[in-house]
Amino acid sequence: MPRRKQQAPKRAAGYAQEEQLKEEEEIKEEEEEEDSGSVAQLQGGNDTGTDEELETGPEQKGCFSYQNSPGSHLSNQDAENESLLSDASDQVSDIKSVCGRDASDKKAHTHVRLPNEAHNCMDKMTAVYANILSDSYWSGLGLGFKLSNSERRNCDTRNGSNKSDFDWHQDALSKSLQQNLPSRSVSKPSLFSSVQLYRQSSKMCGTVFTGASRFRCRQCSAAYDTLVELTVHMNETGHYQDDNRKKDKLRPTSYSKPRKRAFQDMDKEDAQKVLKCMFCGDSFDSLQDLSVHMIKTKHYQKVPLKEPVPTISSKMVTPAKKRVFDVNRPCSPDSTTGSFADSFSSQKNANLQLSSNNRYGYQNGASYTWQFEACKSQILKCMECGSSHDTLQQLTTHMMVTGHFLKVTSSASKKGKQLVLDPLAVEKMQSLSEAPNSDSLAPKPSSNSASDCTASTTELKKESKKERPEETSKDEKVVKSEDYEDPLQKPLDPTIKYQYLREEDLEDGSKGGGDILKSLENTVTTAINKAQNGAPSWSAYPSIHAAYQLSEGTKPPLPMGSQVLQIRPNLTNKLRPIAPKWKVMPLVSMPTHLAPYTQVKKESEDKDEAVKECGKESPHEEASSFSHSEGDSFRKSETPPEAKKTELGPLKEEEKLMKEGSEKEKPQPLEPTSALSNGCALANHAPALPCINPLSALQSVLNNHLGKATEPLRSPSCSSPSSSTISMFHKSNLNVMDKPVLSPASTRSASVSRRYLFENSDQPIDLTKSKSKKAESSQAQSCMSPPQKHALSDIADMVKVLPKATTPKPASSSRVPPMKLEMDVRRFEDVSSEVSTLHKRKGRQSNWNPQHLLILQAQFASSLFQTSEGKYLLSDLGPQERMQISKFTGLSMTTISHWLANVKYQLRKTGGTKFLKNMDKGHPIFYCSDCASQFRTPSTYISHLESHLGFQMKDMTRLSVDQQSKVEQEISRVSSAQRSPETIAAEEDTDSKFKCKLCCRTFVSKHAVKLHLSKTHSKSPEHHSQFVTDVDEE
């Protein structure tokens, strides 16, 4: 197999003078060789096999070392010819490889060379070889000997043989010469020459030191015999540096690299494409550098599993820009891939310089993380109600608390599309809010009002849930009239950061009046969202108590003819459209005796007071209260002008209080009275669906989400006959949110119950700054309710009692009176504790009857037998004993077998169980499970257990099964009492042939009786005949 071409070697500087001396000697030797041509020709003829290695120029054999020792050429030939030469021919060819120079040199000293001696070539050559072999001169001086190129060409002309062929004649001649060597061939051995021969022997050392596997420098291709020499060379020349980072043009073109280094020799750009950190986008030259970077920075933990998105570095985006992006980012989960071009074109252009790898189609890893942070509210979103969360843990808590994961998984097809606030809806809202106030009793067109309310309230919910306050304020400004743009601009700025009322809001907006209303709407809607989130962090909001406890102002009225804002948890990213239903209703004053609205919480107070403060100035006009009620303000539509807001009267405050309380409670009969401010009574009491303000919606949402965790509290004035009606409504309308029905009833004094409604204590901030506190505050102070707690406490209580409240209760049979049923259940429990026939097998939770355990333990102890050495060994209970236990206790044979197998397994594995220790030592200790006393022998243990049981084990078989069946008949009597007579009659009508003795039920087949005994009474089917009788026999 031909070898690779290699470059000519570079000589070390230390050998230059020696080579010059040798070249001068070689010229003289050439002249002598030409004189004695016959000997040289014979020498050359026999030298073919070795000279072909020596004489091949750099183009033929490539590079050899500056030490052209004979062993190197021999081993080259050895490597190519698979070591065909023998040891003898190795030595002879080593000597011959000097190529005639040494031979002629020695002939000059030992013989007189005459031209006629050319015919005696065989004898002369034998003597010459013998002299050369015995002399160590060749091995000492010929180590660094190298022929010049001209001398090689001369030798080439003398060598007529083909260089690639193996010279069989030379091989045979060498072997014959080796056999005829004289004894003086080893007479003058040299230590150096013997070591050199030992190193050059391919038979002993293999190919480690041959020329084919010299230690080579990769940069200059110099070859060395030892690794130490190569190391010294690389340290001196600096060739040890890896040249992977250099371009191909800097490397020698003829240098061929092994195939395994192909990956590392890729272009730098290609390598950077592959060796790239997916998080920060840095490129690396080697896999080791990338690994070190990943381990140090822990970026391997942050590699996102997302498709590439436009590169936006998180370091470049300020919080203000992030807020802008939050406002402009897509709203629905269906369209999370929004356009970033408008808000972030400059950032993207600047960041293109940072991410040099963008031209390869890769994206900076930081953009993934920033994109996730930016769209986190879209990703961590409840699919049921649309609430957003900061962390996955918060979303999980919300799903668990509200039970939304059940609704999402069960109703994936209920996803709705997002409602967009179109310009038409904006116009409708404006026209609705600007309606003339003289028209209060006119019927509203249901279609217009429905669409208006739907669009506006949906938009409000969507915005508040998305927590995009800037966009919210923008929409508000579009919808609001020109009068309120300026006063509302200031107070709405703080609500970008705080969505609850603060002291500054009250101070800044005390003049306009609409700011408190708007801030309170933000408060309520955010509170609804937080309540739906399930895990609100109350400390995160500066003045949430203020938002819930506004009690210093007077209460505004709520007209009867407003709309119902029916809030349900939405299935997508927002609340459902809050469906309005308009009815024509007169302005009727409400009675205040309706105490059953006991769920009047602090939330109702804040809303009332805020609206009251806005409209307390002129309490005489009631005209605009119908169209500009809290429903309009809650929709974030245009708030009425100053003149309209000041028309709310104190008499309608009572209506408002009654309405809110009743709606918060649950659907209740509301009792309109005939008292208006002018004293005229309106007889039209048509049933209508009054407005539910955001606080009522909050209560209903909490009730719906938290599983009605709080029962309505009965206030002292709850003794009216309407309480039973309330309870009926409460039971019948669990599915319905808030649909109060107006029914005529008797009227009571408004002042009786108003004093119990509101409480003035624990007020965090004073909401009546720069306001007049005349009659309104005095009225509010008179309304107190000691049993009421803060809204936050109520919500916290709801969450606390959530697991108990959501646990399904067994439906009680309506046919059995409650008292009788309770007595039967108690009796049933007493009987079943006496004899546990209804077993609940719950794994490791022990539901064993202690009496059954004592019987089993006694039987097991009686089965132990004692050896002659006094040790006790295990034995098994026979089928007869098991049958006796099964008949007496009612346990199935399977249960008994499992208990015995478990006990024996524990004894074999650990040497003891609960009632038996040290069984592995042969001297057991028995423990009583009732009194924990210890016994050494089975007999004393059994007698002790019999004292607990009240009978002896040998008498257990004599005890009749009838005694047990009497007890079980007690149980069956209780259970059959709960069965409907129709099913019993139906069973009796069928062709029943078999009857269960234990419960008196009849069955058609024996198989049915066996199943019944096994499942109901835990009886083994093997002895079912004891408990079954034929109906015909009776």
UniProtKB/Swiss-Prot annotation:
Q: Cross-link Glycyl lysine isopeptide (Lys-Gly) (interchain with G-Cter in SUMO2) - where?
A: K188, K306, K315, K417, K461, K480, K497, K601, K652, K800, K820, K966
Bias class Basic and acidic residues marks the residues at 459-482, 600-668
Q: GO biological process annotations for this chain's record?
A: regulation of transcription by RNA polymerase II
Q: Which residues form a coiled coil?
A: 13-38
> Where is the DNA-binding region?
841-911
**C2H2-type zinc fingers: which residues?**
215-239, 275-299, 380-404, 926-948, 994-1017
List-wise, which residues carry Phosphoserine?
S980
List the Gene Ontology MF annotations in alphabetical order. DNA binding; DNA-binding transcription factor activity, RNA polymerase II-specific; zinc ion binding
Cellular location(s): Nucleus
Can you tell which superkingdom this protein's organism belongs to?
Eukaryota
Q: Which family does it belong to?
A: Belongs to the teashirt C2H2-type zinc-finger protein family.
List the protein's name: Teashirt homolog 2
